[in-house]
Amino acid sequence: MKVLVTGGSGYIGSHTCVQLLQRGHEVVILDNLCNSKRRILPVIERLGGKEATFIEGDIRNEARMTEILHDHAIEAVIHFAGLKAVGESVAKPLEYYDNNVTGTLKLVSAMRAAGVKNFIFSSSATVYGDQPKIPYVES
């Protein structure tokens, strides 16, 4: 399967890319590198055992996202391109809203335009706040 991983050069995204590559999937990594480094890409490929395509870009650019999804014949999107620092989100709420909410909506709109129907969204355990017991209970 041809999979686009947004935020794919971040910590969780890069580990996901390695697993996808090891299982024979074709991986396209999209990242704006605001919280990651380009130097992780050769590591992803070495551990994954094959090459991945890297595109530096932003999920908020809907026209470019539609083009990427179409041009690379993407079949599924795994979305990790969210800002997650709790303290910073309080200091910069509009920036976080723009990236996390507006960006995700633009990504989904681009997916609809390109006919991509498979979507996995990753959140953060921080949405549960400080819990006294692990594992967290979601009910």
From Swiss-Prot:
The EC designation for this entry is 5.1.3.2
Name the residues that bind substrate. Answer: S124
- A biological-process GO annotation: galactose metabolic process
The Gene Ontology terms for molecular function here are: UDP-glucose 4-epimerase activity
This enzyme catalyses: UDP-alpha-D-glucose = UDP-alpha-D-galactose
The reply on keyword NAD is yes
State the pathway, as annotated in the record.
Answer: Carbohydrate metabolism; galactose metabolism
The protein's role, per its UniProt record: Involved in the metabolism of galactose. Catalyzes the conversion of UDP-galactose (UDP-Gal) to UDP-glucose (UDP-Glc) through a mechanism involving the transient reduction of NAD.
| Binding partners and assembly | Homodimer.
Q: What is this protein called?
A: UDP-glucose 4-epimerase
> Top-down, what is the taxonomic lineage of the species of origin?
Bacteria, Pseudomonadati, Pseudomonadota, Gammaproteobacteria, Enterobacterales
Q: Which gene encodes it?
A: galE
